[in-house]
């Protein structure tokens, strides 16, 4: 049964990633991978919120599997982040690559912290 929850969440997260990535990237005339950056930050805040809610006892394991492992796992993408960073480096956009690495890690951490903090304010 657990794997079905993960699959169901992934069936929502994967198309959301694709559609969000395309929508965001189409609005930026830049080599910087704004779409991937956006989905990773959104996923970090959602996972932070879910984790904070779980720590407060407001969410059960089924919802964590559905939204945390399934939805957030499919929404976020470390492999695309890595590939796009490599491509930036290979095409000479080394500054963009460095900003992508530093900015993605920093923004992801801030987003996760914000999600946990929001959950703490809502459920603690």
Curated annotation (Swiss-Prot):
Coiled-coil segments on the chain, per record: none
Quick one: signal sequence residues? none
Quote the record's activity regulation: Na(+) is not transported, but it plays an essential structural role and its presence is essential for fluoride channel function.
Instruction: Tell me one GO biological process term.
Output: cellular detoxification of fluoride
* Alphabetical list of InterPro entries matching this protein: FluC (IPR003691)
Where's it found, cell-wise?
Cell membrane
Chief location category = membrane
Which GO CC annotations does the UniProt entry carry?
Answer: plasma membrane
GO terms (molecular function) for this protein are: fluoride channel activity; fluoride transmembrane transporter activity; metal ion binding
Question: What keywords does the record list, in alphabetical order?
Answer: Cell membrane, Ion channel, Ion transport, Membrane, Metal-binding, Sodium, Transmembrane, Transmembrane helix, Transport
Catalyses which reaction?
A: fluoride(in) = fluoride(out)
Family named by the database record: Belongs to the fluoride channel Fluc/FEX (TC 1.A.43) family.
Q: What does this protein do?
A: Fluoride-specific ion channel. Important for reducing fluoride concentration in the cell, thus reducing its toxicity.
Q: Which HAMAP family match?
A: FluC
Which NCBIfam families does the entry link to?
A: crcB
Spell out the protein name for this chain: Fluoride-specific ion channel FluC 2
Organism for this UniProt entry: Streptomyces coelicolor (strain ATCC BAA-471 / A3(2) / M145)
- The gene designation is fluC2
């Amino acid at each position: 049964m657990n794997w079905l929850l993960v699959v169901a969440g992934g069936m929502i997260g994967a198309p959301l990633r694709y559609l969000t990535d395309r929508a965001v990237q189409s609005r930026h005339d830049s080599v910087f991978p704004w779409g991937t950056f956006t989905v990773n930050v959104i996923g970090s805040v959602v996972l932070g919120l879910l984790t904070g809610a779980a720590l407060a006892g407001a969410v059960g394991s089924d919802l964590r599997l559905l939204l945390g492992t399934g939805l957030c796992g499919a929404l976020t993408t470390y492999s695309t982040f890595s590939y796009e960073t490599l491509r930036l480096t290979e095409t000479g956009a080394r500054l963009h690559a460095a900003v992508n690495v530093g900015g993605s890690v920093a923004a992801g951490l801030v987003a996760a912290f914000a999600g946990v903090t929001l959950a703490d304010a809502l459920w603690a």
